[in-house]
Amino acid sequence: MATTYRICPRSGLQFDTEAEKLMRWHAVAGVLSLLVGGIMALGVILTRWPAVKLLPADTFYMVLTAHGIDMLIFWIIFFEMAVLIFASSTLLHCRLATPKLAWLSSWLMVLGAIMTNVAIFQGESSVMFTSYVPMQAKPHFYLGLILFAVGALINCFIFLGTLVVAKAEKTYEGSIPLVTFGALTACIIAIFTIASGAIILIPTFFWSIGYIREIDSLMYRVVWWGLGHSSQQINVSAHVAIWYAIAAIVFGAKPMSEKVSRTAYFLYILFLQLASAHHILSDPGLSSEWKIVNTSYFMYFAVLASMIHGMTVPGAIEQAQRLKGYNKGLFEWLRKAPWGNPAFSSMFLSLIGFGFLGGISGVMMGAEQLNMLIHNTIYVPGHFHATVVIGTTLAFMGLTYFLVPVLFKRELMFPGYAKLFPYLFGLSMYMVALVMMGAGTLGVSRRHWDMAFAGSGMAYEWPGAAYLMMGLTGIFGVIAVVSGGLWILQIVFSILLGKKLEEGETRSTPIPLTLPAPTTGSHVHPPATPGTMVLALIFLTAFILYYFVNWKYLSSLWGLA
């Protein structure tokens, strides 16, 4: 089949028509997974809300299992596969490598997702997202995850193959664009992640059908977190790439320093997946030396990388705005930003929430001693709702507002809600993350369906503040789920019923990518970014204060005299 290319008249982007179909396929599969996970989230929220306690224990753990897997694995990775295709074939103006194999891998992912969900909803695989042994799920639970992982792994290699095609056919000159470099980082981490999953899930599958007698539980936890937490590091690389992409789309912003941003991505490859260690700091099978090295020296390099991105993205926006004349004071560039554009507002709320809530709490959780304060409490899901929901999901949702007219060729319906959505969903998730972390600091359990332990022989009375925070988790969680559900309806209605837009020119050969020539001349200087510097100092101040408060809290609980 001859390759054809569509030139989008609204964005100027060039799509390999087969790659375009695959992007739509993955985006739709991701949104369907988000729908299932969101419905399950409502059940989780209304059960953990002490005044409601909706579901009985067995149903709650089934719902919690589906929520975790559909949100943290299926929704995120489906969308990331669309991002990989976009960042390679579209941004590099080339054909997709092996489209038939790409379709096969995509079908494997869908089949795996369906198989695992069927196993969960049959009610005998309520092992939760972590699926720790010796808890055993049905064989098709593990088989579904394996098929999904194989499909995703094939897609990763197709992405790498597409980069080779672009280089061989000379569709671009020089280095790949920064967004593509970010996607390459995500791909490399994904290969490590999926390999970790295969190493542990394949023998666990054989254990579930009786071919292997037992799986060592400590070994399982160590290897599984190479999948469980590293899959979230794919998210970080992908959503940071989306931050850069939206900054370029909305403002025409250019990175403050390509070399610095690429170096930060390289630090992700070397050190980011080591953050998995904070999940197993209480495990006896690992040496103190290993724990200390991974949760201090190595992890700090990954933190440094995120702080670099957290400064260069708003810095690039500030430079672009100041070049347009928004130079009054420290923050006119930010005040005059297009806050009514949902792509921008989603991205900026994602950036702030990921840094201040997810980043700071993640470093605190990753410190071996401080981890004892919140290990296995509801602080942990509070942290990853700040990273995965606010950081990743909100960024993906913001990009979708750009993709509806460009990729799906439909006019967005309900534009008024689009302006409201980032604030309704984003700020409610800010509150969910904050009050979850507050309740976790008071010791509320991470997963127990009834925080009051009703009927227990050793009941425990929590302080009133803990019940208040769990109640607020319920209130703001419902707001977030409802607003997210309305977003899904808006996107589905737009794709199915929105006004059809002009498709654009179709060509049989790609137009080579031409990057703007670098500006020469000693008289040209990018504008200073004092506003970004102030934001960075505010972040560092909050970081230091929160770190100090937690060490002070630990010292009050763990007296040495």
Language-model regions, residue ranges each:
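Membrane-embedded and interfacial regions of multi-pass energy-transducing membrane proteins
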Residues: 2-514, 532
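Short, membrane-interfacial amphipathic segments enriched in basic
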Residues: 213, 518-523
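Final/C-terminal transmembrane alpha-helix of multipass membrane proteins
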Residues: 348, 427, 534-550
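Homeobox/homeodomain signature
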Residues: 374-376, 519, 544
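Juxtamembrane cytosolic/matrix-side boundary and N-terminal portion
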Residues: 521-540
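Juxtamembrane boundary at the C-terminal end of a transmembrane helix
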Residues: 546-561
